[in-house]
């Protein structure tokens, strides 16, 4: 896929000014130049063009907010002064796997005052004597070269993964906020259901009590009727002897 078509695809109906991260890896650049990328991408902070066949960065637009640039596995051999002009706030630059042979090629990077991390893995320049020491002298603003500082301590976030992880963290935070909101809605619905169930239980409990009370009343009435019946029979038995006595007279 051509680079300009890939850019159009990556936009996903967004405007260029809405894009902060753009990954164009493994697409095809015509004549080894950047194409389809304009200065309308004014908010772009991360650009990756790994293995796209670049031989030059001359067509790079003005990207003042760009902090991380991935150019690894291309055929770039020079012309890096363009980076200082077009991406003045660059902090991470990966040129691994390009045709950089000597220190003079990377000397223009001195103008990138904010550059903290530079990667030159698999470039011929890394075979020079005292390569690391000389690069740190040439670019004193650097903190990490090929993932390690001057004291050979590894960078906390290998290469520029830290920046990408930062973007991912932001997305995760948004997802968590959305999840929390959804969870709260579910909890509220569950609370409402529990309240309704509680009310139903109260109502059914009252009905049961009323039924029990009604039944108790029926039992009491039956007992009263039985007692009355016994009394009446007793009175009849008393009257019968009396009646017999009167007959004798």
From Swiss-Prot:
Residue ranges, compositional bias (Acidic residues): 157-230
Give residue numbers for the modification (Phosphoserine): 17, 158, 204
LRRCT domain mapped to chain residues: 123-161
Q: Name one GO biological process term.
A: regulation of apoptotic process
Keyword Metal-binding attached: no
| LRR-type repeats, residues | 18-38, 43-64, 65-87, 89-110
The annotated regions of Basic and acidic residues compositional bias extend over 147-156
Q: In which tissues is it expressed?
A: Widely distributed in the central nervous system, with an abundant expression in the cerebellum.
- UniProt cross-references to InterPro entries, sorted A to Z: AN32 (IPR045081), Leu-rich_rpt (IPR001611), LRR_dom_sf (IPR032675), U2A'_phosphoprotein32A_C (IPR003603)
Segments carrying the region annotation (Necessary for tumor-suppressive function) are: 150-174
Annotated segments matching region Disordered: 147-249
Which residues are modified to Phosphothreonine? 15
* Keyword vocabulary terms for this entry: Cytoplasm, Endoplasmic reticulum, Leucine-rich repeat, Nucleus, Phosphoprotein, Repeat, Repressor, Transcription, Transcription regulation
Q: Identify the GO cellular component terms for this protein.
A: cytoplasm; endoplasmic reticulum; nucleus; perinuclear region of cytoplasm
Segments of this protein annotated with the region Interaction with E4F1: 165-249
| PROSITE patterns noted in UniProt | LRR
Give the GO molecular function terms.
histone binding
Q: Which domain of life is it from?
A: Eukaryota
Annotated compartments: Nucleus; Cytoplasm; Endoplasmic reticulum
PTM comment for this protein? The N-terminus is blocked. Phosphorylated on serine residues, at least in part by casein kinase 2/CK2.
Give the multimer and partner information: Component of the SET complex, composed of at least ANP32A, APEX1, HMGB2, NME1, SET and TREX1. Directly interacts with SET. Interacts with ATXN1/SCA1. Interacts with MAP1B. Interacts with ELAVL1. Part of the INHAT (inhibitor of histone acetyltransferases) complex. Interacts with E4F1.
UniProt family annotation: Belongs to the ANP32 family.
Report the protein's function: Multifunctional protein that is involved in the regulation of many processes including tumor suppression, apoptosis, cell cycle progression or transcription. Promotes apoptosis by favouring the activation of caspase-9/CASP9 and allowing apoptosome formation. In addition, plays a role in the modulation of histone acetylation and transcription as part of the INHAT (inhibitor of histone acetyltransferases) complex. Inhibits the histone-acetyltranferase activity of EP300/CREBBP (CREB-binding protein) and EP300/CREBBP-associated factor by histone masking.
The protein depicted here goes by the name Acidic leucine-rich nuclear phosphoprotein 32 family member A
């Amino acid at each position: 896929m051509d680079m300009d078509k890939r850019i159009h695809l990556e936009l996903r109906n967004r405007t260029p000014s809405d894009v902060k991260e753009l990954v164009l890896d493994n697409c095809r650049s015509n004549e080894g130049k950047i194409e389809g990328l304009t200065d309308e991408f004014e908010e772009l902070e991360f650009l990756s063009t790994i293995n796209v066949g670049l031989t030059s960065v001359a067509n790079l637009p003005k990207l003042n907010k760009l902090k991380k640039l991935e150019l690894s596995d291309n055929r770039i051999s020079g012309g890096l002064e363009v980076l200082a002009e077009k991406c003045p706030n660059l902090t991470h630059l990966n040129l691994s796997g390009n045709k950089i042979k000597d220190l003079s090629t990377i000397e223009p990077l001195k103008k990138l005052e904010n550059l903290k991390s530079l990667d030159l893995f698999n470039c011929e320049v890394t075979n020079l004597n005292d390569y690391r020491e000389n690069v740190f002298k040439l670019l004193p603003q650097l903190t990490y070269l090929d993932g390690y500082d001057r004291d050979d301590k590894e960078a906390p976030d290998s290469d520029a993964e830290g920046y990408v992880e930062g973007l991912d963290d932001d997305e995760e935070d948004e997802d968590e906020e959305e999840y929390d909101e959804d969870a709260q809605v579910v909890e509220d619905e569950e609370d409402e259901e529990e309240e309704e169930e509680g009310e139903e239980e109260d109502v059914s409990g009252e009905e049961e009590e009323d039924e029990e009370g009604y039944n108790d009343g029926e039992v009491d009435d039956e007992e009263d009727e039985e007692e009355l019946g016994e009394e009446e029979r007793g009175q009849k038995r008393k009257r019968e002897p009396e009646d017999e006595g009167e007959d004798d007279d």
